[in-house]
């Protein structure tokens, strides 16, 4: 991207140089022809003023462009340093924005992972029936919110938790038979 801007800058400098060169050629040609008595003589100060004005306009526009480019580069640098300040290898979905514009919470992801590990360990050990208090789970599901304050789709969340609970209860209560 920077290479494109550098090439564009060189192109602008070349175009400006060709304009100046063509202006000088025009001035030399007009001076080589004798002026008639009826034509007013051009004031050399006026020509220099026009040339300085066009150069100043170009310089002003180019300076504004460079200032805006420096500001964009600075903002990009700030964003990159914020993302990489800890130099931690991140999964692709961490710190990315959801469709609603909310950020994934590292703490909740960690806690959910720990709960899943504990649940799998509990299933592997094959302990007895685990009771799930329905009222507490439903209240927790209704109270969950995204970071931006919008409610998640509560009905789907509740139905998913009920289906999961029924499936786990079915797994626990089903006797395992070995077919030989």
Swiss-Prot record:
Disulfide bond entries: none
Chain segments carrying region Disordered: 25-59
BP GO terms, sorted: adenylate cyclase-modulating G protein-coupled receptor signaling pathway; glucose homeostasis; negative regulation of apoptotic process; positive regulation of insulin secretion involved in cellular response to glucose stimulus; protein kinase A signaling; regulation of insulin secretion; response to activity
Signal peptide: 1-20
Site feature: Cleavage: 52-53, 83-84, 91-92, 97-98, 130-131, 145-146
Record keywords: Amidation, Cleavage on pair of basic residues, Hormone, Phosphoprotein, Secreted, Signal
Main location: secreted
Keyword Magnesium among record annotations: no
Molecular function in Gene Ontology: glucagon receptor binding; hormone activity
Post-translational modification: Proglucagon is post-translationally processed in a tissue-specific manner in pancreatic A cells and intestinal L cells. In pancreatic A cells, the major bioactive hormone is glucagon cleaved by PCSK2/PC2. In the intestinal L cells PCSK1/PC1 liberates GLP-1, GLP-2, glicentin and oxyntomodulin. GLP-1 is further N-terminally truncated by post-translational processing in the intestinal L cells resulting in GLP-1(7-37) GLP-1-(7-36)amide. The C-terminal amidation is neither important for the metabolism of GLP-1 nor for its effects on the endocrine pancreas.
Stored Gene3D superfamilies: 6.10.250.590
Keyword Signal: yes
Subcellular location per the Swiss-Prot or TrEMBL entry: Secreted
Modified residues (Phosphoserine): 54, 105, 108, 150, 152
Residue numbers covered by the propeptide annotation in the UniProt entry: 84-89, 131-145
Induction and repression of expression: Glucagon release is stimulated by hypoglycemia and inhibited by hyperglycemia, insulin, and somatostatin. GLP-1 and GLP-2 are induced in response to nutrient ingestion.
GO cellular component terms, A-Z: extracellular space
Arginine amide: residues bearing it: 127
Family of the protein in this entry: Belongs to the glucagon family.
Protein's UniProt name: Pro-glucagon
């Amino acid at each position: 991207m920077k290479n494109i801007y550098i090439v564009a800058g060189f192109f602008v400098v070349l175009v400006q140089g060709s304009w100046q060169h063509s202006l000088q050629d025009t001035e030399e040609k007009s001076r080589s022809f004798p002026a008639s008595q009826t034509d007013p003589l051009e004031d050399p100060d006026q020509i220099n003023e026009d040339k300085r004005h066009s150069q100043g306009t170009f310089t002003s526009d180019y300076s504004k462009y460079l200032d805006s480019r420096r500001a964009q580069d600075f903002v990009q640098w700030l964003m990159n340093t914020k993302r990489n300040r800890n130099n931690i290898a991140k999964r692709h979905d961490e710190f990315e924005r959801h469709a609603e514009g909310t950020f994934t919470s590292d703490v909740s992801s960690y806690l959910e992972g720990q709960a899943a590990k504990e649940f799998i360990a509990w299933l592997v050990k094959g302990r007895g029936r685990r009771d799930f208090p329905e009222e507490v789970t439903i209240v927790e599901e209704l109270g969950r919110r995204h970071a931006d304050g919008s409610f998640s789709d509560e009905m789907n969340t509740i139905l998913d938790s009920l289906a999961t609970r029924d499936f786990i209860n079915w797994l626990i209560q089903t006797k395992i038979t070995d077919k030989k």
